[in-house]
């Protein structure tokens, strides 16, 4: 604690002492002084006196000096010491003595100074009056000690100034000057009178001395004078001169400027500036460079330097003239300083400088530039030009306020010394004055060009001048083009081709090009001459040029490229301007230049670039029908020139003829006659370019150029006017292209190819050109055509295979004579192409198209047909290809199988079956056995031997080659109990739970695991329909739509009808009962009065609904009255009642009575007497006895299959048992005679029946009387020796090659291989020897396929649409009336009918005439009820038909699919063998059998069915036929008949006229098109009149038949499809329909539209707005009867439709190709559209029919199960998979299996009849 206290107390003491409050301490110095005061003794004085020797005195003086410095001497001791030694200062004394005394004085002054007093004056006087000028240093030291270095002059004031002056004269040194500085600072007032001489002396010292130290100290003295005294005015000039000189010393520059700045800050500042200006202007100082430089420096620094003195008011204008004068004599240093000074002035105060100041500055600059001519100073030159650059920058920044003209004159005067940037500014400035408002502006432009272009070597400057010239030309050429070109351009630029600067050459060439582009005078040729000289430079590199220098050399040739590209631009402009001769010359110049490339073999990259761009432009040339040339703009729209033609001159063109080829190219439309002089038209013959193109194809070495030419050629070849209006040899073009592909050295000559380049890339580029060249086939030699086809065949092995296939498809259409010879080999080659997704669509569409060209494959052997199937079958694999490809593959297989020659089909069935198994069925199987089928089944090596040999079949019992026998008897055994169709049970038991999904992409394992069952079933159903199709057509060519002749209608009138479900077929049997005969002979007056209505007519129940333009998935029958648009749909399939006269050639109507007389009679027919009423009584009685004889024994069998219907009409030839009371039927010959005899009794010979038998309708042949040899063979004739044991097979079913036995789908053991496929093959193997060629089957196309006429018919189609159109449609239609049916008889097959009969009998008295009750209709359909009286419905009973009020109408015969009559039905029990129920039914039958048998005439249909089907050991219940049990199932059959057995397509057709490409309303408003459009429509199909169409026979796609949608349209058909075209121009354009909605409701709902684009502009997808417009087939008409076909599709369709394909097709084949493209696109669109609803996928009507039949079977099963729930269903659940069980025992023989089945179960066939 003590330490802080002591510390604090110490601080306090210090503060007290500081403030003077503390106790005073004794002064130690005083005490010490008193103690140390030195006493001068006498002895000391004696030793100092003269008594002693000199040396002793000097020694003692030294000792006293030490004492005097440190100790105080006693009072008066100094005086004593001075007196003792003063004598030693005499001059005669030695210097040592003097120096010792002076040292003693210095010591006394230093040690005893404050005690000397007046002695100071004494000592100063001693120094001042020193006898000599020696000892200056010692004296100065004493003076410094006396004055404390000049600070204190006490007692010295009066004599000090004089002493200083004296001393400066003798001893002016730096030491003295330092003392003088202090004297001036501290005692200046004592020096005033002597300042001037002092300054003078110091200035002289500064000027004369060379010591920088002296000068520096002198400057300090002068600074002290200026700062602490007043510099005399008279000393100012010398003072300034001194500083001006001194400032040139580098080390003294700063102190000098500081001193000058101090001076200028005084009142003498302006005087100093003035003096310095005087110095600069004084002629006497002109040679004194340092002085002038210093003056310039000080003035510049003082007035505008970094530390300028703002007190100075001198302006730059006042001092700059002095600067100018200072430069009178050239001096590098002065000029340099002046440049620095004015540069500083300009940079810092540029905004404050006035014009006057700038004038002086420019004078100075000009003088500086002049001095540079004489002064060799790089530094000065650099700084002077930097000064000019600074001024330029001010000009650029608009901060220069002087005269720009004068400045740029300076720059121009010394332009060769100025940098490029300065000259560019100069040229820019000069260019501003070159305009017509300036006098002599053209001369100024000439001078500018002469000065800075011709005589200048710097590229940038010359380029700038060219820019100025270009700008002047651009602005003034409109009025002064003549003068500018004459005076400036040609004179100044004529030397450009020889100019050494390649950049200048390039820009000058570009200028010439720009000028020539707009020049329309004779000077154009002069300009083009210069350009041609530039282009004439050789593009070959020097031989000694090294490879690394090639790039530099190529850059020097850029002017040539500029010239060529410029000519392209000029040509593009000159095409549309006059005179046209300019365009001609440019075109010829270009062609000549490119020819030089190939002549001299230019191979530099720049040469290739020139050719690349030249060809890129020239191949854009287009021509129209008037031969006018044109080019497309940036939007692709071609604008044609009114002045330039693509042909040669008229005389040349008239004399030109084709040198080679079978035909000369047509001259096309004549060239337009010019309205003015002939010279106004220019001729640019395309042949010149064509020859260069040929050179390119033959000699080009750069792949980029060649690829460009090949890519552009196809589009150019579309414009045939280009080729045919001048001598262009397409033969040579074809030859060159083919040589490129065949020559092995083609690849060797090419360079610049990408990595991995191969012949494949070459093919990819050449094939499109060959494709486009196909349209020139008429003008190609046959040899060239064959070469083209050969090259396309060779391309099939490369990546361009898809393009080659498309090209070959076009060849097939356009060059049939060539392709027909190559086609057999080509088809075989196509089998070598791997089945990939990229090849699928082109290949399948090619085969689809080829199938419709029968004249091409009429000579095909079995190998070619097998190749087609080998190509198609792999694409049926749903795990590899999308749904469209699979469906298209099935379509191709079906088409080719139908078109295949009949003898070959049998052997193709197992081949196709195996392919389907390996590609489709096994893809859904996960069992190990499927691996054996993974090998490609369609390999040609796996074909049957009979197909590979393809020999002609021998004549014998069977015309087809022998089939391959089954190797295992168990396979044949299994076939006998299986149906050919893949049953639903087997399908579902074989399908895996994870398969391909509905996506269109190719499936992989992951997608297969997530697929849904609908798509799995779809592909299996496709396989089923394919097998069903082969069963239909393997032994026949009959169509899928049977027709019933009038004789058949007569025979089967009122017949008994039953329908069975056998596998996937519906078998309807109708037997005759004699009703037609009785009606004919008038024996049944009730029938005739009733209009002879059918007793089995279910079509009398009809309903009328308003028709809407709905999508027609299945073609429902439509019949519209003239008053309203009603669709009349009957229960038998929605087919309307016939209105008008019956078409005697209408399609077949099985099972129905053709009341021909009633249908042909007018409405008042019931009032006329019957034919039978005119007969005499005796004759009538006679004929009554023959009624049973006439028609009993006849039966009709109608088989409904997924792929169509087949019908037989047959007669029973077996004689009746002698124990029977029935009368045998009359043979057909006698029946015909009887019918003819009956006609003799008729008085009214104009009845419809008579006409139908004797007078054919218009366009319809008279039905011939059938001879006995052509009748259907009797059953007894079926039994051939080779067919014993196969009696259950019917020869009548030869076209399907199957028996009516159903396989056992419910067996516990299901083999891996589908049994249906084995059954089908077995059926072919066992039935071929059982066929009878005389089995009669009605068909519209039964002629031989080998006949050419039949080939053409197949090409046109197999479904006779034209026969479905009434040929008497113009006749007035008659009203419909419903007549009472035939008397209904009770049936022995169903107890329910008896009850119904009783009820109907009770209601008979309450009926109203004209309404037939549904119950009565049930009986009329079955044809088995009693015939005592007609049954009528009660008045209040609901009816499904509204009878027209006009009166009763005669009903037509009922129809089934496409106009077929629906089958009657019998309600029967079709359940499996159930003993209890069968006993009850048998008991009931036994009660009614006798009476029914007596009342119902004719043969029971069950008798016919059992003869064809029955086998006593068919297997379990699921194999048995199923009899349709009730009316609801009959309606299902009628619904099946509504689904046509052919695919339907509806295509929109629109015409786009000129200017309509973007207007939907204008397009829809078109009512007609061009002539070529009309021809195109004519070829699309057959023109039909809608009002005469029967919609149940002709697919109309929703078109109204009473005129609402027009009167006519076009439709087309072939064997398996129908297409209708919704043609906008044929639809009415209604004024009230402003938006054309009536048209758009059809056109907008069509998936595919054919757009005939005659507008000359591009048509864009979406112009016609619609939700379902997926694809557009765009037809663009070209010249010379050719057309361009392209496809447009929505983005989501791009994977299904190839929009990159463009086809050029002639008018002759346009309709065919467009229709094919539209049909294929529509198939793809249907697949795409149905993808959005995968639960309802119907890619074809065949599948729709198949599914309908399967649903019918399921319904029957469910109803049977419902009626007896105790019984199990026949089949396992639909989605239950039945595992396959491997057999554990050896396969039993046929006899063993038959015996086991017979023992286990003997069938009771009465259950299903």
Swiss-Prot record:
One of its GO terms (molecular function) is protein-containing complex binding. Residues 1078-1097, 1376-1392, 1449-1464 have a biased composition (Low complexity). The keyword Cell cycle does not apply. Its main location: membrane. Residues 1533-1760 form the Rap-GAP domain. InterPro entries: ARM-like, ARM-type_fold, Rap/Ran-GAP_sf, Rap/Ran_GAP_dom, Tuberin, Tuberin-type_domain, Tuberin/Ral-act_asu, Tuberin_N. GO terms for cellular component: caveola; cell projection; cytoplasm; cytosol; dendrite; glutamatergic synapse; Golgi apparatus; growth cone. CNS, uterus, heart, skeletal muscle, kidney and spleen. Phosphorylation at Ser-939 and Thr-1466 by PKB/AKT1 in response to insulin signaling and growth factor stimulation inhibits the ability of the TSC-TBC complex to suppress mTORC1 signaling: phosphorylation promotes dissociation of the TSC-TBC complex from lysosomal membranes, leading to activation of mTORC1 by RHEB. Phosphorylation at Ser-1388, Ser-1420 or Ser-1422 does not affect interaction with TSC1. Phosphorylation by AMPK activates it and leads to negative regulation of the mTORC1 complex. PANTHER family: TUBERIN. Catalytic component of the TSC-TBC complex, a multiprotein complex that acts as a negative regulator of the canonical mTORC1 complex, an evolutionarily conserved central nutrient sensor that stimulates anabolic reactions and macromolecule biosynthesis to promote cellular biomass generation and growth. Within the TSC-TBC complex, TSC2 acts as a GTPase-activating protein (GAP) for the small GTPase RHEB, a direct activator of the protein kinase activity of mTORC1. It is linked to A germline insertion in Tsc2 is the cause of the Eker rat model of inherited cancer susceptibility. Gives rise to a spectrum of epithelial and nonepithelial neoplasms. This is Tuberin.
